[in-house]
């Protein structure tokens, strides 16, 4: 069991002011994180076929296996992912890729959340205008070489697609809160739906530019974007190292003042700000 951990520089460029410039991958990660809140729950199955295409399915809450029929809540949850890292992927005629969405999702409409195009990726935040496919009587979504093929572009080297049920409410939350889950072991971490609902965000880069005014301090910008982190489902936020940099230039980390030099000292920004802000910005 693992908890997803998203890195700042996957979403924003390392250089420049904090959160000022989005990376080429921002839209994809933004779409996936929001969808994780809305759809991801229940049991999981993963497999790799003879074409080295990986499929991963989450069945939705109250369904741990493909044979579970679940509840009405299960019906609008769950997600199917298709991944290949082969830019030359070409399925032979008659070959298919199947997402076994499970018995809870028989004869159901699914829509693309994210799909590969010749030029990059297409994103669909709602049911409107999204490509639609239907599961069969076994709950299978079946795709042919008409829709699955390898590409090479700045967004994708291979193939990527994500499918979710049609008809989910925009404010649907498939996560499980920790305070609703009973733990009976003496372990620190418990493998359950509550742990599965966690997301860690490493929210800083060692190489970002120095702030030119107080509005650009990392800790100020983080507070201003709290709603966005909530939409992403972030439950643990790894802040930048709140250290007073030595600035003695004897070591790379003291030159870029990232808080990792040998003589740096922990300081939230008392008196004068650190690279990341003043103590009042942390308190806010």
UniProtKB/Swiss-Prot annotation:
Pfam family, any one: Glyco_hydro_70
Keyword flag Coiled coil: no
Protein known as: Dextransucrase 1
Biological process, per Gene Ontology: glucan biosynthetic process
Molecular-function annotations in GO: dextransucrase activity; glucosyltransferase activity
Source species of the chain: Leuconostoc mesenteroides
Enzyme Commission number(s) of this protein: 2.4.1.5
Family matches, as InterPro entries: Glyco_hydro70cat, Glycoside_hydrolase_SF
Signal peptide (residue range): none
Catalytic activity: [(1->6)-alpha-D-glucosyl](n) + sucrose = [(1->6)-alpha-D-glucosyl](n+1) + D-fructose
Additional note from the record: The dextran produced by Leuconostoc mesenteroides CMG713 has a molecular mass of about 2000 kDa and contains exclusively alpha-(1->6) glycosidic linkages in the main chain.
UniProt record similarity statement: Belongs to the glycosyl hydrolase 70 family.
Superkingdom of origin: Bacteria
SUPFAM superfamilies per UniProt: (Trans)glycosidases
Entry keywords, A to Z: Glycosyltransferase, Transferase
Protein function: Involved in the production of dextran, an extracellular glucan polymer.
Group of enzyme by EC: transferase
């Amino acid at each position: 069991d693992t908890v997803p951990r998203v890195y700042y520089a996957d979403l924003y460029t390392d250089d420049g002011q904090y959160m000022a410039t989005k990376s080429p991958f921002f839209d994809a990660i933004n779409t996936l994180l929001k969808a994780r809140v809305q759809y991801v729950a229940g049991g999981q199955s993963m497999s790799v076929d003879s074409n080295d295409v990986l499929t991963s399915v989450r069945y939705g809450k109250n369904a741990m296996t493909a044979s579970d029929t679940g509840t009405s809540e299960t019906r609008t949850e769950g997600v199917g992912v298709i991944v290949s890292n082969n830019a030359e992927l070409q399925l032979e005629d008659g070959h298919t890729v199947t997402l076994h969405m499970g018995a809870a999702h028989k004869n159901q409409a699914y829509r693309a959340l994210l799909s590969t195009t010749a030029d990059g990726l297409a994103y669909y935040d709602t049911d409107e205008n999204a490509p639609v496919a239907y599961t069969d009587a076994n709950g299978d979504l079946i795709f042919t070489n008409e829709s699955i093929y390898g590409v090479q572009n700045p967004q994708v080297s291979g193939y990527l697609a994500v499918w979710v049920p049609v008809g989910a409410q925009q404010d649907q939350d498939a996560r499980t809160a920790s305070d609703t889950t009973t733990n009976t072991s003496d372990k620190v971490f418990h493998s359950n739906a509550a742990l599965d609902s966690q997301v860690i965000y490493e929210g800083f880069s060692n190489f970002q530019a120095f702030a030119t005014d107080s509005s650009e301090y990392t800790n100020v910008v983080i507070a201003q974007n709290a709603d966005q982190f909530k939409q992403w489902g972030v439950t643990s936020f790894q802040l930048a190292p709140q250290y007073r940099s030595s600035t003695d230039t004897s070591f790379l980390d003291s030159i870029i003042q990232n808080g990792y030099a040998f003589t740096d000292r922990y300081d939230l920004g008392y008196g004068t700000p650190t690279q990341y802000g003043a103590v009042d910005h942390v308190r806010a």
